[in-house]
C-alpha cells in the first residue's frame, strides 16, 4: 500500500473570533493528486498556508515527508513547492530573471540553477519566452511561470492553490494537462479548487471542505455513492429576468443558497441556486422533470435549457450541505 507523504491531524486555525479551519484531518498519498474541493471561504487557502508553514496552526499537527508541523519548518519548506493563488512574480523582470530570484531563495546558483531553469521552462512550455519580461505575459502564462518557480528545487510535494482562477479556458486546459503530467512523472500534488469539474478530471482522491470542516473524503466513485441513484436537473436561467422573478415570487435563494420553489414536488430531494442556474437533485430525472418544468413555468422563470446529469461531486456537495459549490 502507498504510504502518505502528508498527514494532517485535527488542524485548526483561528483569526480573532473567526475559526477558519475547524479540526480537519486527512492524508495525501505519495504519487497522487489529492484535491481539496470547496467554495470560496471554506478554509482551503488557510489549510495550505498552515501546511506550507506560512502561518502557525492554532491547534493540531501535521507531518510532511517525516517533518513535523509545527517544529521543523525549514525541512518542511525544502520538501514542498508552493504555487500560490496570487501571482508572485516581478513584472519588470524576465521569466528567467524571476526564476533566478526564486532559485536563490532555495540556495540554488550557478550552472545547476541555470540548467534547472531550462528544465522547468520546458515543463511549463515557455522556453521560447525566457528572455521576455513578465509584464508582456498573459494571465495564463504568468500562472505557468508561478508553477515553474514551485518546481525549481525538485519538491517531493507540490501545493497548488486555485491555480486556474481568472485565466482563459485554453490556459486552464494547459495547466490541468500539466498537473496530470507532473503526477505521471511521480510528483505528489495537493490541489485546491472550487471548480467541481477540475476535481473530477484531476483527482485520485478528493476532500470536500466547507465552513472550515472536512465533510467528506474519498475517490469520486466513493463520494458519489453518498447520493445513491440520484440524478441532477440543471436549469439554466436568463440572468436578470430570472433573478427578479425569483425575488418577486418570494422564492429567492435563502442565506445558505437553497431554493424553496420546488419543495414538495414528487421526486425532488433538494434544490439550490448556483450562479445563474438552479440545481435540483431528484430521485429519477424522467419522473421529476415534468413537475419541475411545470413549477418553473408557473413561476414565470426564464429557463433557457435543462441538463440531466448523473451523480457528480457538485451533487454530493449539494446533498451534504444544501448549497451549491459556488454560493
Model-derived regions: residue spans:
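A short linear hydrophobic-aromatic micro-motif
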Residues: 125, 267-271, 302-307
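C-terminal coupling/interaction segments
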Residues: 281-327
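Preference for bulky hydrophobic residues occupying beta-strand positions
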Residues: 13, 26, 235-237, 280, ...
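Non-catalytic surface loops within mature trypsin-like serine protease
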Residues: 30, 128, 237-239, 284, ...
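Conserved NTP-handling cores and scaffolds of large molecular machines
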Residues: 106, 227, 231, 266, ...
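Conserved protein kinase catalytic domain
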Residues: 77, 121, 224, 317-318
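ABC transporter nucleotide-binding domain
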Residues: 176-283
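ABC transporter nucleotide-binding domains
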Residues: 3-8, 13-216
Amino acid at each position: 500500500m502507498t504510504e502518505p507523504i502528508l498527514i494532517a491531524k485535527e488542524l485548526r486555525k483561528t483569526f480573532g473570533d473567526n475559526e477558519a479551519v475547524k479540526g480537519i484531518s486527512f492524508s495525501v498519498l505519495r504519487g497522487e493528486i489529492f484535491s481539496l474541493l470547496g467554495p470560496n471561504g471554506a478554509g482551503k487557502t488557510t489549510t495550505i498556508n498552515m501546511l506550507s508553514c506560512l502561518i502557525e496552526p492554532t491547534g493540531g499537527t501535521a507531518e510532511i515527508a517525516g517533518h513535523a508541523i509545527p517544529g521543523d519548518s525549514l525541512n518542511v519548506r525544502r520538501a514542498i513547492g508552493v504555487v500560490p493563488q496570487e501571482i508572485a512574480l516581478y513584472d519588470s523582470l524576465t521569466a528567467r530573471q524571476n526564476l533566478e530570484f526564486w532559485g536563490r531563495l532555495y540556495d540554488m546558483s550557478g550552472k545547476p540553477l541555470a540548467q534547472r531553469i531550462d528544465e522547468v521552462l520546458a515543463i511549463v512550455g515557455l522556453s521560447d519566452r525566457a528572455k521576455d519580461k513578465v509584464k508582456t505575459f498573459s494571465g495564463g502564462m504568468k500562472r505557468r511561470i508561478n508553477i515553474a518557480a514551485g518546481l525549481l528545487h525538485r519538491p517531493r510535494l507540490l501545493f497548488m492553490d486555485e491555480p486556474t482562477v481568472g485565466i482563459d479556458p485554453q490556459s486552464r486546459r494547459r495547466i490541468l494537462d500539466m498537473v496530470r503530467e507532473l503526477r505521471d512523472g511521480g510528483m505528489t500534488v495537493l490541489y485546491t479548487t472550487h471548480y467541481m469539474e477540475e476535481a473530477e478530471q484531476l483527482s485520485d482522491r478528493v476532500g470536500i471542505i466547507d465552513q472550515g470542516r472536512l465533510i467528506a473524503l474519498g475517490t469520486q466513485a466513493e463520494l458519489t455513492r453518498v447520493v445513491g441513484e440520484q440524478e441532477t436537473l440543471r436549469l439554466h436561467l436568463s440572468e436578470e429576468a430570472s433573478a427578479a422573478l425569483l425575488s418577486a415570487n418570494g422564492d429567492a435563494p435563502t442565506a445558505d443558497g437553497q431554493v424553496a420553489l420546488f419543495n414538495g414536488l414528487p421526486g425532488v430531494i433538494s434544490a439550490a441556486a448556483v450562479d445563474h442556474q438552479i440545481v435540483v437533485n431528484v430521485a429519477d430525472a424522467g419522473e421529476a422533470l415534468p413537475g419541475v418544468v411545470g413549477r418553473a413555468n408557473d413561476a414565470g422563470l426564464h429557463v433557457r435549457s435543462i441538463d440531466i446529469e448523473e451523480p457528480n461531486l457538485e451533487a454530493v456537495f449539494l446533498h451534504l450541505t444544501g448549497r451549491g459549490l459556488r454560493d
